[in-house]
From Swiss-Prot:
Zinc finger (C4-type): 748-774
One GO MF term: zinc ion binding
Naturally occurring in which organism (per UniProt): Methanothermobacter thermautotrophicus (strain ATCC 29096 / DSM 1053 / JCM 10044 / NBRC 100330 / Delta H)
Chain's role: The UvrABC repair system catalyzes the recognition and processing of DNA lesions. UvrA is an ATPase and a DNA-binding protein. A damage recognition complex composed of 2 UvrA and 2 UvrB subunits scans DNA for abnormalities. When the presence of a lesion has been verified by UvrB, the UvrA molecules dissociate.
Protein name in the entry: UvrABC system protein A
Keyword Nucleus: no
Residue positions binding ATP: 38-45, 649-656
Length: 962
């Protein structure tokens, strides 16, 4: 039956009921580009990821053995009747790659693996000391070099036969015995071959055969014996000889028939292999930083974040946490001050350099310390260790996780002083192709790397050797360019990628794999992508389809929807009001369907209108001076206060660096006097006009099911107080804490207030069942007996915001908070809905609602990074209304955005560019949308088209916001 479905070209879904899906029946065409759209919370992800992908993945995992299944994340069977016609499913979602410091763009895409192979095969090694190209050594040259040693020195001639390979290697020992050898060196220790060897087969071992043991002499007889031994060692060691010195333990020279420096430096290389260029292998990794490229060290700027303070005012933060002036550390500093003759009341930055250095790094001079404790005085003469060395010592020696975490707050990553951040050994960095090392190549932008390999000049022999490797490298670089990531470098750490960038990298990797007959499910691949690059992304998706794959894309981007072969519109509302297929068919059929809200926006029946009037600058500005982090080119940026400002620009132009790394962190540091490691800039002016800065992003409002909209917005506190004031609760002496499921007393102790019990199934998916004691209600029976207007606390948490708004209409402090949730379009979510089940867009709107419910000071700076992620046209209209309310109250909103509906609605635009990466980092246009549209920038060009479609005349500029 399944085979027939696949041959008939359809994926058939019957009775899908996962989450809010309402018994959905659907037939999707195979080998097509399908878009699933609908408003936030309508059930798109429930259909695409939690039903179609989950079932495809579950069936694959079930085909494996029970032993293998226990090591894989088994997915639970979705709520549905059946699905037919599924192919193997691959999900490419918005989740960022794992924050592994060893993971880079190059390793994720496997381009770095091909680069390692390329450099190993055609790279030219150089001496990293003198710079000369490495030459091969003959056995005669090796003998000459050994003869140069001092007469009388004892040496051993070793031939490496096993290098870092797992196994017991018994056959190696037998072969050496048969050849008449007497001794071997195993893992650095000399043994007789007659010994019994019991090596751990799961560990890597190195074995060298002892060919000869000699005392260096200058005569002919010695030279002949040495030459014979070297020839034998070269034969056994496949061209490599090791000569450890018995007079200097640990010193060992390596001679090779393959690579050795012809100059006086005498540098010798082992055979050049791909692992020599891997920073994850001891053969390639820098020994100082172990291939990380950076070292975690105590940062003086974090130890003394506010040098304008004196030591008595707490300048040395880690030694001031108690706030007491008579503590142990303060007594030490007082002794240092008395010894050197400076005052603890002098601002730290005004102290002499010698005194600052003595405080931070210690002194060689002995100082008399006087310690007072429990009315006793102790005197001791000793050297002062210094704040930073003491912290480093405690960090290394302590077994306390708390102490390591605390000291970790004062540490930051610095480029490794040995490799300079390249991660590799000097030998690896000295191998070049066309004058470029592998580090030089990965530091290029992807576009520059593509141009480098396209124009590579090789000999005929090198071209023949590298043909297939170069083909793979060029293709994969081209795929990354096609998905709009040409500005990234191959060395970029995966942990610094946005969700959209990480997803498009995985997309490019999948295209490179060339798989056919696969079901790909993508989550908004257009996020983070400028309109200029959107067309290339769509062409890439079509190429993946044309290979013979089915693409299901959850998307809201208009151009992507219109480019699809088939569109499914889920709705009509969100939550309980959604979960149905409102319309499906070609984009044209969707546009003509009167029931489709998406179709109404696509056809122009519904629009996000331009604002009637734009707010005018009040003359007050927040000015960032000398922004120079990442690719920003020491720019000054003026942000008008009291306005809705959009920061735009092509991908990689520097928007996130400017707004998140510099503006948000810089303002937060200054307003809250807490170090946030802000990006490089000179100053931020105009802070006297704002009292706080708030970042409203799409991160979850909580990491556990205990967190929910009611607890996050604070409305649950008022609700618990209401229950505590009921006559029955007062009679029993119940306080508000009784109605919390986070503390003992009122919660069900069988499930700890979770309402569910987790049952581990090992090789099957974990099963979550309702608690048998409280039946999923979280509270014990005594607590549930307390009722407010006929409802107990569990029933109130099960209400939607819409229902609760009506229920609490006479309680102002509850109604006000619920009203803001309703106003941002979240009337359908339940008060007690676990935070883990909220989408990114829903979480962001809960945060917006919380801000709206606060009593406005009119002086808050709100920062949002791509708030339209996961939002439908209709959701964006609601978002703009909410942002308008915040700004109308006198606050300032700064939004990073690519969505043209948001950009056209802004009061002010700051456009960065002109391109991404090194070709970006400048302010290329600023002003009203009309003024930016008149510029020649990429954003201006697309904005001009949108404004021309909407209305021909300019939007009038309104009154001053101040």
């Amino acid at each position: 039956m399944e085979t027939l479905r696949i041959m008939s070209g359809k994926i058939v879904i019957k009775g899908a009921r996962e989450h809010n899906l309402q018994n959905v029946d659907l037939e999707l065409p195979r080998d097509k580009f399908i878009v699933i759209t609908g408003i936030s919370g309508s059930g798109k992800s429930s259909l695409a990821f939690d039903t179609i992908y989950a079932e495809g993945q579950r069936r694959y995992v079930e085909s494996l053995s029970a032993y293998a299944r226990q090591f894989l994340g088994q997915m639970k069977k979705p709520e549905m009747d059946y699905i037919e016609g599924l192919s193997p499913a691959i999900s490419i979602d918005q989740k960022t790659t794992r924050v592994n410091p060893r993971s880079t763009v190059g390793t994720i895409t496997e381009i770095y693996d091909y680069l390692r192979l390329l450099f190993a095969r055609i790279g030219k090694p150089h001496c990293y000391l003198c710079g000369r190209e490495i030459e091969q050594q003959t056995s005669t040259q090796i003998v000459d070099r050994i003869m140069d040693d001092g007469e009388g020195e004892r040496i051993i001639i070793l031939a490496p036969v096993v290098r870092d390979r797992k196994g017991e290697h018994q056959r190696v020992f037998e072969r050496l015995r048969e050849q008449g050898f007497v001794r071997v060196r195993v893992d650095g220790e000399i043994h007789d071959l007659e010994d019994e060897f019991d090596l751990d087969r799961n560990r890597k071992h190195s074995i060298d055969v002892v060919v000869d043991r000699l005392v260096v002499r200058r005569d002919t007889e010695f030279r002949k014996r040495l030459a014979d031994s070297v020839e034998t060692a070269l034969q056994l060691g496949e061209g490599t000889v090791r000569v450890p010195s018995t007079m200097t333990p640990g010193e060992e020279r390596i001679y090779s028939e393959h690579f050795a420096c012809p100059g006086t430096a005498g540098i010798n290389f082992e055979e050049i292999s791909p692992r020599m260029f891997s920073f994850n292998s001891p053969h390639g990794a820098c020994p100082e930083c172990n291939g990380l490229g950076s070292k975690l060290e105590i940062d003086p700027d974090l130890v003394v974040p506010y040098p304008e303070r004196s030591i008595n005012e707490g300048a040395i933060v880690p030694w001031s946490k108690s706030g007491k002036r008579d503590n142990y550390y303060h007594q030490m500093l007082r002794a240092v001050a008395e010894h050197y003759g400076f005052s603890l009341d002098t601002p730290f930055r005004d102290l002499d350099e010698e005194h600052r250095r003595a405080i931070l790094y210690g002194t060689d001079e002995k100082i008399q310390f006087v310690f007072q404790r429990k009315n006793r005085t102790y005197r001791v003469n000793r050297r002062f260790e210094g704040v930073i060395p003491r912290m480093e010592r405690i960090y290394m020696e302590t077994k306390s996780n708390y102490m390591r975490t605390y000291i970790g707050r004062f540490m930051s990553n610095h480029a490794c002083p040995v490799c300079g951040g390249s991660r590799l050994r000097p030998e690896s960095l000295s191998v070049t192709i066309n004058g470029r090392s592998i580090h030089d190549v990965v530091e290029m932008s992807i576009r520059e790397a593509h141009e480098f390999f396209d124009s590579l000049k090789l000999t005929e022999r090198e071209e023949y050797i590298a043909r297939e490797v170069l083909k793979e490298i060029r293709e994969r670089l081209r795929f990354l360019i096609d998905v709009g990531l040409d500005y990234l470098t191959l060395s970029r750490s995966s942990g610094t990628l946005s969700g959209g960038e990480a997803q498009r990298i995985r997309l490019a990797t999948q295209i490179g794999s060339g798989l056919v007959g696969v079901l790909y499910i993508l989550d908004e691949p257009s996020i983070g992508l400028h309109q200029r690059d959107n067309r290339r992304l769509i062409e890439t998706l079509k190429r993946l389809r044309d290979l013979g794959n089915t693409l299901i894309v959850v998307e809201h981007d208009e151009e992507t929807i219109l480019s699809a072969d088939h569109v499914v519109d889920i709705g009509p509302g969100a939550g309980e009001h959604g979960g149905c297929v409102v319309a499906e068919g070609t984009p044209e059929e969707i546009m003509e369907d009167p029931d489709s809200l998406t179709g109404a926006y696509l056809s122009g029946r519904e629009t996000i209108p331009l604002p009637e009037v734009r707010r005018r600058p009040s003359g007050r500005y927040l000015t960032v001076r000398g922004a120079a982090e990442n690719n920003l080119r020491e720019i000054d940026v003026r942000i008008p206060l009291g306005l809705f400002t959009c920061v735009t620009g092509v991908s990689g132009s520097g928007k996130s660096t400017l707004v998140n790394d510099i503006l948000y962190r810089g303002v937060y540091e200054r307003l809250n006097h807490k170090h946030m490691n802000a990006g490089r800039h000179t100053d931020i002016e105009g802070l006297q006009h704002i009292d706080k800065v708030v970042m409203i992003d799409q991160s979850p409002i909580g990491r556990t099911p205990r967190s929910n909209p009611a607890t996050y917005t604070g409305v649950f506190t008022h609700i618990r107080e209401l229950f505590a004031q009921t006559p029955e609760a007062r009679k029993r002496g119940y306080r508000p804490g009784r109605f919390s499921f986070n503390v003992k007393g009122g919660r069900c102790e069988a499930c700890g207030g979770d309402g569910i019990i987790k049952i581990e199934m090992h090789f099957l998916a974990d099963v979550y069942v309702p608690c048998e004691v409280c039946r999923g209600r979280r509270y014990n029976e005594e607590t549930l007996e307390i009722r407010y207007r006929g409802r107990n606390i569990a029933e109130v948490l099960d209400m939607t915001v819409e229902e609760a708004l009506e229920f609490f209409e006479n309680i102002p402090q509850v109604r006000r908070k619920l009203q803001t949730l309703y106003d941002v379009g979240l009337g359908y979510i339940k008060l007690g809905q676990p935070a883990t089940t909220l989408s990114g867009g829903e979480a962001q709107r809960v945060k917006l609602a919380k801000e709206l419910s606060r009593r406005s000071t009119g002086s808050t700076l709100y920062i949002l990074d791509e708030p339209t992620t996961g939002l439908h046209f209709d959701d964006i209209k609601k978002l703009l209304n909410v942002l308008g309310r915040l700004v109308d109250a006198g606050n300032t909103a700064v939004v990073i955005e690519h969505n043209l509906d948001v950009i056209k609605s802004a009061d002010h635009i700051i456009d960065l560019g002109p391109e991404g990466g090194e070709r970006g980092g400048l302010v290329v246009a600023e002003g009203t949308p009309e003024e930016v549209a008149a510029s020649g920038t990429h954003t201006g060009r697309f904005l001009r088209e949108v404004l021309a479609d909407e209305r021909s005349q300019k939007v009038p500029v309104g009154q001053d916001t101040g």
